[in-house]
């Protein structure tokens, strides 16, 4: 257990807390006319002079202290400042970009007016109102599905992934590598943190240039104890996230961002197993890329893809998303919503963006849109991080409801000033944002009604809905049902081809059922958006019977990044 220092409160300047952490020093006390300074590295003349200037020119004496102790002291003594900045830093910087409030004042007025108008029309012309609603929903459903189809089809023609060869990695000198920070927010993960320490301990990067910051909530003593029992290497730092609200992953990450020393920074989840050379590949990819590229996204896939039907569908979805959809968005220079993990950032650019929005439960998607609005771009690096796919239905619904609720939040936040966003990113990119971020939850909300209406109308001979719906409405529903599902089945069939996992292709025919599950989750998401918008529905990890260390047989030709065992 790391014991924090007890610095003199008069010497500790809260406004310099980021400087203290990133530069690795801290004023402790006055001793015989000098200021004793805790420092993580011996003071060079240049660094000594810089610290003296920061302390008003007073002479200093050094006290070598591990970086972990310096960070622990800061987060302990300045916990109120860290908690406040992590929760409300973005809101103070730009209230309009924060999901702290679900609706702005003008949005509330618009919603009330729309509800009143719809209620009046529903009373006076109920059937006409219902038909208009179905017609509008049909347009949104089909437009969003067609958008995804054509973007993915476009992406299938290109390979824009930053490919890095082994010879390039071998040519890297440790002395030339930049400092890299790994952030790992964990909460109630005592059962898997030992595996986490092993997985991140395999990263091929000089430990003198690497800091792994594990962010643990203040009340989560069980996880903190489990980390200590796993005996992590010295470059692992456990940072206590001060109590506060909202208790979300992005809030914890904001604390980590304040103490991060790396030129580059990556987020991993507790169950992640990145390829060992991922950091080096990303350094090379950033060196090649235009300065406007501030994020590199590594691919994600699952080590337990073959566990059951649900995990197979997960793997199909991720294969299509990372191999085709992201590439298609990049080709068209459209906004790219980030994945929740394996995002590699230029740290300074991330700070300029205001970090993560702690009130948005899909902070990754929101950050991708904010980056795009400032002219930044997202790149893709050819490295895969293996994760645990949710294998239990209840956990899946909870996880997807959080993701869909976050898309709803992101759409509402960036709809507050639509004309400003259009000026920033252009009309075409705004349209793409609308179809992807707003269209996705709206599409899922429409799946159950469209499916039910279609089945009742065309597959139940005894049901006659002609008294309520003209044939044209019913045929539109059938068209949506057939075309929408056919396109998504086709896209999911495309996913495994690039990876050679042909054994997954047939499972894509179950996508209509998979979408029904998403539709259930979307209604839960909508309810939570109204009742508890900032609630973070945690996904339980460590539930799978599959592990990276205990491979199981996979069909011939299944590549390591999509097979059930990930066989590494």
Spans of features found by a protein language model:
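Cell-envelope/extracellular polymer assembly enzymes that use nucleotide-activated donors
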Residues: 178-181, 211, 351, 366
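Polyanionic, low-complexity intrinsically disordered segments
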Residues: 1-54
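Acidic donor-binding segment of Leloir-type glycosyltransferases
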Residues: 201-244
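The conserved acidic donor/metal-binding loop of glycosyltransferases
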Residues: 269-273, 356-359, 371
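Catalytic donor-sugar/metal-binding loop of nucleotide-sugar-dependent glycosyltransferases
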Residues: 368-386
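Membrane-embedded multi-pass helical conduit in multi-pass membrane proteins
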Residues: 121-165, 172, 435-531
């Amino acid at each position: 257990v790391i014991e924090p220092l007890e610095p003199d409160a008069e010497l500790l300047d809260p406004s310099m807390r980021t400087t203290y952490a990133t530069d690795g020093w801290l004023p402790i006390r006055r001793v015989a006319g000098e200021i004793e300074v805790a420092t993580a590295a011996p003071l060079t003349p240049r660094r000594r002079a810089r610290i003296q200037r920061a302390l008003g020119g007073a002479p200093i004496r050094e006290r070598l202290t591990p970086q972990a102790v310096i960070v622990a002291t800061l987060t302990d003594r300045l916990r109120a400042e860290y908690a406040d900045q992590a929760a409300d830093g973005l809101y103070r910087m730009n209230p309009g970009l924060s999901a702290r409030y679900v609706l702005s004042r003008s949005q509330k007025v618009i919603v009330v007016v729309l509800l009143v108008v719809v209620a009046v029309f529903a009373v006076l012309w109920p059937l006409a109102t219902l038909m208009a609603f179905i017609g509008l929903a049909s347009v949104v459903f089909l437009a969003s599905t067609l958008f995804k189809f054509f973007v993915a089809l476009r992406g299938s023609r290109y390979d824009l992934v930053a490919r890095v060869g082994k010879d390039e990695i071998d040519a890297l000198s440790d002395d030339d590598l930049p400092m890299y920070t790994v952030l790992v927010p964990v909460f109630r993960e005592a059962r898997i943190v030992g595996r986490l320490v092993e997985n991140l301990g395999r990263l091929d990067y000089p430990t003198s240039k690497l800091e792994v910051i594990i962010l643990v909530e203040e009340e989560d003593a069980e996880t903190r104890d489990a980390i200590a029992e796993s005996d992590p290497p010295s470059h692992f730092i456990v940072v206590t996230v001060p109590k506060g609200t909202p208790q979300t992953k992005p809030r914890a990450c904001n604390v980590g961002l304040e103490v991060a020393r790396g030129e580059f920074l990556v987020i991993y989840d507790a169950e992640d197993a990145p390829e060992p050379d991922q950091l080096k590949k990303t350094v090379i990819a950033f060196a090649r890329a235009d300065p406007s590229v501030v994020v590199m996204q590594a691919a994600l896939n699952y080590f337990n893809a073959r566990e059951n039907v649900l995990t197979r569908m997960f793997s199909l979805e991720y294969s299509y998303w990372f191999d085709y959809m992201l590439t298609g968005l990049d080709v068209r220079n459209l906004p790219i919503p980030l994945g929740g993990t394996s995002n590699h950032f230029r740290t300074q650019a991330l700070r300029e963006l205001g970090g993560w929005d702690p009130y948005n439960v899909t902070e990754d998607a929101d950050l991708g849109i904010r980056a795009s609005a400032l002219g930044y771009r997202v790149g893709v690096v050819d490295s895969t991080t293996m994760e645990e796919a949710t294998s239990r239905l209840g956990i899946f619904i909870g996880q997807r409801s959080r993701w869909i609720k976050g898309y709803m939040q992101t759409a509402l936040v960036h709809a507050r000033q639509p004309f400003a966003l259009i000026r920033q990113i252009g009309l075409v990119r705004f349209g793409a944002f609308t179809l992807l971020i707003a269209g996705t939850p709206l599409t899922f909300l429409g799946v159950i009604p469209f499916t039910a209406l279609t089945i009742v109308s065309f597959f139940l001979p005894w049901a006659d809905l002609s008294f309520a719906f003209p044939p044209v409405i019913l045929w539109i529903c059938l068209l949506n049902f057939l075309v929408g599902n056919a396109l998504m089945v086709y896209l999911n069939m495309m996913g495994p081809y690039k990876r050679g996992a042909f054994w997954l292709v047939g499972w894509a025919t179950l996508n209509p059922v998979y979408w029904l599950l998403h539709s259930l989750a979307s209604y839960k998401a909508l309810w939570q958006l109204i009742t508890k918008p900032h609630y973070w529905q945690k996904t339980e990890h460590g539930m799978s019977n599959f592990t990276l260390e205990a491979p199981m047989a996979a069909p011939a030709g299944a590549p390591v990044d999509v097979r059930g065992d990930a066989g590494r």
